[in-house]
Amino acid sequence: MKSHLLHCQHITKYYQEGSQQTQVLKDVSFSMQAGELVAIVGSSGSGKSTLLHVLGGLDQPTSGEVFIQNQSLQKINANQLAQLRNQYLGFVYQFHHLMADFSALENVMMPMLIGKQNRSEAQDRAEKMLTAVGLSHRISHRPSALSGGERQRVAIARSLVNHPALVLADEPTGNLDRKTTESIFDLIKQLNQEQNIAFLLVTHDLTLAEKLSRRLVMQDGVLREEH
């Protein structure tokens, strides 16, 4: 198999609710290379978020296979999966999921501390990431003292602190105003170029998706390339 950063083949996903079975993903196959910036667009309920969860190993497909750096997520155990996610993947969500009692700096340090990394090294790297997202002056602030855009920048810094090869972002600007949304997208493009981090963004914002070099469209569980 050709070397891809991310590769999925024939992904199908069903959800069972009582006697009702719903197919959410229908034979999805696609690949991403290192450093790519890709958007998946589609209406609410089209299967975008489900696909992102499957690609990130947060949910299992009913059938099909996902490969990260040529390693199948379906052929490793839970500990190996957690290690692979920590090594290669970062996650950003519509809601920042920051811990309210911790400062911006402490929130960004958290993935490294969980990974048992040296505290002073974790602090140094977290400070650098907060500087990279334009928040060097806000590192001691708790989430409640930050704006919505600033909180999402902290979440992006946290997703990047372990130097992932790929960041999976689920509607990262979904609850932000237009000006803030555009600044977050500009930040993602800047980080992509400067650090060669690949981003896969799920969004329903077609205007922003058009700024990216590659777009995929999800409709009723079917993924197709937009040309």
UniProtKB/Swiss-Prot annotation:
PROSITE patterns: ABC_TRANSPORTER_1, ABC_TRANSPORTER_2, LOLD. ATP binds at residues 42-49. Disulfide bonds: none annotated. GO terms for molecular function: ATP binding; ATP hydrolysis activity; transmembrane transporter activity. Part of the ABC transporter complex LolCDE involved in the translocation of mature outer membrane-directed lipoproteins, from the inner membrane to the periplasmic chaperone, LolA. Responsible for the formation of the LolA-lipoprotein complex in an ATP-dependent manner. NCBIfam families: LolD_lipo_ex. This is Lipoprotein-releasing system ATP-binding protein LolD. It comes from Pasteurella multocida (strain Pm70). The lineage of its organism: Bacteria, Pseudomonadati, Pseudomonadota, Gammaproteobacteria, Pasteurellales.
